[in-house]
Amino acid sequence: MGKEQELVQAVKAEDVGTAQRLLQRPRPGKAKLLGSTKKINVNFQDPDGFSALHHAALNGNTELISLLLEAQAAVDIKDNKGMRPLHYAAWQGRKEPMKLVLKAGSAVNVPSDEGHIPLHLAAQHGHYDVSEMLLQHQSNPCIVDNSGKTPLDLACEFGRVGVVQLLLSSNMCAALLEPRPGDTTDPNGTSPLHLAAKNGHIDIIRLLLQAGIDINRQTKSGTALHEAALCGKTEVVRLLLDSGINAQVRNTYSQTALDIVHQFTTSQASKEIKQLLREASAALQVRATKDYCNNYDLTSLNVKAGDIITVLEQHPDGRWKGCIHDNRTGNDRVGYFPSSLGEAIVKRAGSRTGSEPSPPQGGGSLGPSAPPEEIWVLRKPFAGGDRSGSLSNVAGGRSTGGHALHAGAEGVKLLATVLSQKSVSESSPGDSPVKPPEGSSGAARSQPPAAHAGQVYGEQPPKKLESSSASEGKSAEAVSQWLATFQLQLYAPNFTSAGYDLPTISRMTPEDLTAIGVTKPGHRKKITAEISGLNIPDCLPEHKPANLAVWLSMIGLAQYYKVLVDNGYENIDFITDITWEDLQEIGITKLGHQKKLMLAVRKLAELQKAEYSKYEGGPLRRKAPQSLEMMAIESPPPSEPAAAECQSPKMTTFQDSELSGELQAALSGPAEAGAAAAEKSSNHLPATPRTTSRQESSLSGRARHMSSSQELLGDGPQGPGSPMSRSQEYLLDEGPAPGTPPKEVRSSRHGHSVKRASVPPVPGKPRQVLPSGVSHFTPPQTPTKAQPGSPQALGGPHGPATAKVKPTPQLLPPTDRPMSPRSLPQSPTHRGFAYVLPQPVEGEAGPPAPGPVPPPVPAAVPTLCLPPEADVEPRRPKKRAHSLNRYAASDSEPERDELLVPAAAGPYATVQRRVGRSHSVRAPAGTDKNVNRSQSFAVRPRKKGPPPPPPKRSSSAMASANLADEPSPDVETEDGRLGVRAQRRRASDLAGSVDTGSAGSVKSIAAMLELSSIGGGGRAIRRPPEGHPTPRPASPDPGRVATVLASVKHKEAIGPDGEVVNRRRTLSGPVTGLLATARRGPGEPAEQSHFMEDGTARQRLRGPAKGEAGVEGPPLARVEASATLKRRIRAKQSQQENVKFILTESDTVKRRPKAKEPDIGPEPPPPLSVYQNGTATIRRRPASEQAGPPELPPPPPPAEPPPTDLMPLPPLPLPDGSARKPVKPPVSPKPILAQPVSKIQGSPTPASKKVPLPGPGSPEVKRAHGTPPPVSPKPPPPPTAPKPAKALAGLQSSSATPSPVPSPARQPPAALIKPASSPPSQSASPAKPPSPGAPALQVPTKPPRAAASVVSGPPVASDCASPGDSARQKLEETSACLAAALQAVEEKIRQEDGQGPRPSSIEEKSTGSILEDIGSMFDDLADQLDAMLE
């Protein structure tokens, strides 16, 4: 170790001898002798930069310091921190070492690296003599260190009274006490008074006050009172208040000292401080004359009569801010209360007494005009009384603080955090208009201080209590008192810190209690029990406020306005989309506030849904869940050209559960209540409303139902007499109705409606609100939902249909609709309902003209009619456009516009159409199922007792294939509006209305109706593509055919594929009829065969046959049966014009039973059908819907390719039928349902059958016009392959045969289903037979259903004929009014048989009757299905 290091060590160890030895000069002679003349380095520094002099100064050893200085040691050498020996000498505090160093010439004002000069260190450590010596050597006491503190600041902070006196006596005192610029903004800004107050140095505070420091000097944290209050320095607070500090001054966070105490301190000392501050800040005390509580306003003060309230200030709106001290608990509650609530206890003396007649008036003198002294006086009484008077000597000081009171009221913004609850601070006056959301409190803050002070004691009662909840203080006390009632007040902090008030606590769950720290099971159980006993209203607004700020204020969470706005929730409509996760993400973390917000959001969403359902049925549209099957068309009215159809515009899916009460209400005025019930119940809860609708025997009642369903579906023209439901209006408009809820709202609603979707609405009750001619109404998206609703409305007469519709999901666009598994399964059942409703409506209301119906359809947003090849009105294409919205409705599936042709058929078609979308078709497994949802199918089977087990997957696959095929035909022609695919799609949707212009409309309709009863008729009857006029000419009344097809199509549309849905249904469940027909064989009665093959087709035969008695009679019926089957498939694909069969609804029901494909024999399986077969069952319904469109078969040649299962159907759509049918049993997107059936039945067979059976558009489809539609057996879509075989077997005879072919695959299920399905089919049949003409009656819809249920061909054959009669009988039994309506329709159809297109209108009416019957059946089936699903 070198000598330098030895020297440093010796000095450090205060070894003077060694240091002297090392520092001695060697003798010259010796040095020379030794050769060491080297001198030691006295300034050597160790690694820390310390030299020997540093150590000597730090140790205070004067001998070593002198020795080193003599050795020429540098006096101002710096260590690594910039500290010089003088710094260490000052720090050490010894006078002699300081003298030595100062004498050596050390600089006194050179700072260290931290900015400290020696005086800082001496003052901080209280070295009076050293400080005095430094001052004598001209040390500057105003130099600030890096933290902005002067030596005086440090002395005050550390309580060095002597040094403070020394510094204050220096000539720099005034400069030291002057406020520095930037103190209020500099985070480090401070003052000697703040530091002394913060640390409780009372003597120093007195010295500073005597020296003349500004007592109200402010920094960023506020005044010294803020610091003392926050740090709990009670005596300092008292001293400052006695010295006249302004207790109203607010810091940069808009907090007063009292606010800070409320918010941040909980110690015992804080209670006394609160009292002191209350007294100092209050200018008046009042006694409450009555109870007051406003739990909606976070800033309000809950008081009881007799409470003593210390008035703190007045809000600009006239309310007073007061504080109530609870002597028992020591808690303070701060908040606003009406100025009229209290009476002054003491009238203050002074300038203010005169102006203080009453508490409200007293504030006047406090106004800015009042001198500070006056204000001081106001506060003084409290101070004098409570503070035992340092008031006397404070009067002067207070004069300075008097204005502070005003300033506090005026100047500073009050943050929510200031109050105990953060809302207290918000409520405090003087807040600048910091937060509009804060409402009244915000207003108060915005008021200027003077004005505020003047009003402090509120001249008039508050104009409004804008904050929504009691202030935190009052809420905390209320919670504490409540907990005290059962000795668990120890949890009060848990509740209050989490932001819970009593109204929110009353909605807490045990999980919520655990989340806030109530972890002891015994305590949690006790609190839960007490919560259950709380009877506190939710205090949530009962109406939708104008904006977010008002809403937040109403629920007492105005402090979150800025947070919500900053995060994109500035619109009151956006807030309904917020979730718990969103609240957490944007920083609203208090569990109580989160819960209150979510409760309020839920209530707001309910209000919005109610509003939309009331004005637009909007909630329905919104609610549409993911299920795409039931899609209402919102696109332009069917009047639009084919282009509209192609656009597949605004069809939103109808999810069964989505039909909420609101939706139901929207769908049918009378059924609104029922709808709500339905929503609550499962899919079928609305059964009662449906029954009611069905029970309406009078035509007027029917018309009413029809109007509602038409409204929903936008069916074609309704009789002017028949009112159109609101939904229909929207649908007819096909454009967003003015009332259409905004997309945002829709989305929010959508979330809510998803749950509802599972519950079928009670559409059964028609919305009588709208006149039949409501077509001019523009349905908002509600129409989409409304359309299913319309089927419901139509089904309304048939209670079951109504209940099942649950089209609410429909309202939402397919995308909007959440696809919930539950929703999807339920949707099949609901769909059934939806379909049913439209048909009964049509049948019921004479107003909808068979042919003209389509024109009115535009009025109803949902244009259910496919654009007829020639007859179909332009708006039918709209249906196509609507198809876009519903995913299930594939191109092959006719849009609602098409279905719209006949009012009843249109609605029917609409529902089904949703299901049978090209998309659905293409997405066989997931999408199709969801799309098909078996809603309509499931619903229908329910009507007749337990629905048969769900159809086998094979039928589903077939249906899917059909759907897939349909789209291409739809595109090709669809009545010139859309390609065949588009037509088919419409045909599916508009089962009845689509084929209005196709040939053989009456018989096609009958066949479609039959298929409809089975569930596949619609598709079978699918009208031929535009390119195939031949089938069209065959149909006498395109309108009628369209009507029938519409109904048929509806059934089909619901199929899992979308269009094949109905067919599937027929194949799996209702397919029983198709299978029965096939089994029956070509030789068997066509009617029976049709019913067996496709309820839709058979119904169509029935309706058309009756209407067309002259045209073809039974033969046509037969041909139609097979044609209907194929058409149905086709209808799904192309949605032909003939798709208008209303029977499709019934058929769907039948198919539902037949959905037994899984071999679930009992009717009850349909619920399963809805899921497994569900697709098939649903498809059935789509088939019904598409049954209506079957007349479109010609237009939907593409439908043929898509429907693998629908192979026969594709031919049906083709005018030639045989040539047109897609031979392959394509497994549409729903291979599960369609493919299995297809495989079982064999795709080859369907292909062959298809040859015999012209496409739905083929003559048989058009057969309604007189030409048997071989492709009619569209119903067999599920067993597409078999159906084609049937078609090949023979157009007319083959109708039965094709059914049998599919039956092989499905036969076991069908057979199983037969028993269960028969009753439903019969039930549906009765409704259907009346609707068709006499011949149609021969092939009663019921029989088709029975046939469908009796999957076996032969039994079905026998059932077909007799079931038609029995169906009619059953219809009469079910509802005399339905029977009468059906008879009237039949007569009309008969009259129109020779007329050609006329039969279509007659058929529409008959279809409406059939729909009613179907509705009845659906009611039964729905009930059964509900039971099964449950």
From Swiss-Prot:
Keyword Repeat recorded: yes
Domain annotation SAM: ranges: 474-537, 543-607
Residue spans crossing the bilayer: none
Listed Low complexity bias regions: 667-679, 1283-1298, 1308-1326, 1344-1358
Biased composition (Polar residues): 421-430, 683-711
ANK repeats: 48-77, 81-110, 114-143, 147-176, 188-217, 220-249
Compartments where found: Cytoplasm
Function statement: May link the scaffolding protein CASK to downstream intracellular effectors.
Protein name: Caskin-1
Taxonomic placement: Eukaryota, Metazoa, Chordata, Craniata, Vertebrata
